[in-house]
Amino acid sequence: MAKAKFERTKPHVNVGTIGHVDHGKTTLTAAISHVLAKTYGGEAKDFSQIDNAPEERERGITINTSHIEYDTPTRHYAHVDCPGHADYVKNMITGAAQMDGAILVVAATDGPMPQTREHILLSRQVGVPFIIVFMNKCDMVDDEELLELVEMEVRELLSEYDFPGDDLPVIQGSALKALEGDAAWEGKIIELAEALDSYIPEPERAIDKAFLMPIEDVFSISGRGTVVTGRVERGIIKVGEEVEIVGIKDTTKTTCTGVEMFRKLLDEGRAGENCGILLRGTKRDEVERGQVLSKPGTIKPHTKFESEVYVLSKEEGGRHTPFFKGYRPQFYFRTTDVTGTIELPEGVEMVMPGDNIKMVVTLICPIAMDEGLRFAIREGGRTVGAGVVAKIHE
């Protein structure tokens, strides 16, 4: 079969399967791939191809992840599936696989299990915005009431973590039966795909968001003023627009009087581009690496936040020994390191390499941040952990 041409015309959405071990995440991934390829065209991936997840490195952290793609009539999906629980934890915390929505797989034969809860909590902490439930192995449960009970339990568990448990879609199906070509169960996979299309809104593209550029370098150009350089993270900056300089020091306002790229003058700089931005009336010593340029009023500097952190194992080049409360490493945000102190959850005395943990961080100077911002934890330039801002305190 000829490979379908990748169409840029369809909106692109990132999703993934989450849930307890052996509840059928990988089987469901294979079933979606097969049923959608059969129904709408495309290439089907087998269970064994997906299960044999290649090893990747994200910020020095080893993660096993399978990536597959599939199409519905209106969208193109990129879907991630991980073999082990630890891979999910690392994936979600580093943002290696940023999900616009997740498919929570729960076996009807078991109901919600410890990792079901943990993956829902992680989704909440790292900011996965939407969850759809696929109740799997429903062919093995004869009792209609039991299925209703499991569905109710899952909905309550999601509500507990502030997802709209009463309103989100729950599809009862059997991934294995669908994979074996049973038409009735294949219909449930189509139903799941339709739920993805209708329930997960089209993600806002980086270019449509409010302008933000982390400052990497500062130069003064005689007769012209101060130029800051960096890669535009989101949005568009046009010549003549007001910008704020946020982080480290007090926030100040200035105007963009020029945009340069590869020594050419432009009218604007866009998300993904490396630009130099000329700032009106700003002195060279008033800006520094680690600050951000942003559209006024869209991002604030903060020093204290709750985070979800994965601590690198010794094998990944992390610490060989645990750390305790009072630990003072550097937190690397976007372009710079800031020293901070940590508070561990009650009853936690120490954190071992390879653990994931919730911690409250207090930085010695403020950094421009939103919930969902990723950071690295470093000691003398060496990465020992990865984290995500879950909740801003002050």
Swiss-Prot record:
Residues 136-139 are annotated as: G4. Its EC number is 3.6.5.3. Its main location: cytoplasm. GO terms for molecular function: GTP binding; GTPase activity; guanosine tetraphosphate binding; translation elongation factor activity. It is found in: Cytoplasm. It is an enzyme of class 3 (hydrolase). The keyword Cell wall biogenesis/degradation does not apply. It catalyses: GTP + H2O = GDP + phosphate + H(+). GTP binds at residues 19-26, 81-85, 136-139. This is Elongation factor Tu. Mg(2+) binds at residue 26. Residues 10-204 form the tr-type G domain. Residues 19-26 are annotated as: G1. Residues 81-84 are annotated as: G3. PANTHER family: ELONGATION FACTOR TU, MITOCHONDRIAL, ELONGATION FACTOR TU-RELATED. GTP hydrolase that promotes the GTP-dependent binding of aminoacyl-tRNA to the A-site of ribosomes during protein biosynthesis. Residues 174-176 are annotated as: G5. One of its GO terms (cellular component) is cytosol. The keyword Iron-sulfur does not apply. The lineage of its organism: Bacteria, Pseudomonadati, Pseudomonadota, Gammaproteobacteria, Alteromonadales. Keywords: Cytoplasm, Elongation factor, GTP-binding, Hydrolase, Magnesium, Metal-binding, Nucleotide-binding, Protein biosynthesis. Belongs to the TRAFAC class translation factor GTPase superfamily. Classic translation factor GTPase family. EF-Tu/EF-1A subfamily.
